[in-house]
């Protein structure tokens, strides 16, 4: 399994959580973004910088993705592509996307996008909190524990 991190908008508070997991389990990790994102120093982490442009990082993740890989992203359309390709996706707030729920999240995202495009003023996402970081850490840990059990 490879861990992919969609580097766009990755909260800094998650970087040490990710680094600890990567180092503890020696998980091959690719951070993909259009600028350098420093997660931490580890031989397990590779930084891939893509050119500027819509969905360039997303396209690179999908190109490199294998079934069962895990992608960390807050990008719901990317999560949908990951699930469709047989991968797994967790967002920054600890939501684990699956084939059972991704279409719901995508529909909600598209609904709110169309409301915003119509000129309606909507609230943006809630500020990222320590509680969100904790939920993310728990979901990542649970996913990695299931993975370790399957290896045995």
From Swiss-Prot:
Pfam families recorded for this chain? DUF188 (PF02639)
Membrane spanning segments where? none
Spell out the family assignment given in the record's similarity comment.
Answer: Belongs to the UPF0178 family.
Name the record gives this protein: UPF0178 protein NIS_0137
Organism encoding this protein: Nitratiruptor sp. (strain SB155-2)
Q: Taxonomic classification, please? A: Bacteria, Pseudomonadati, Campylobacterota, Epsilonproteobacteria, Nautiliales
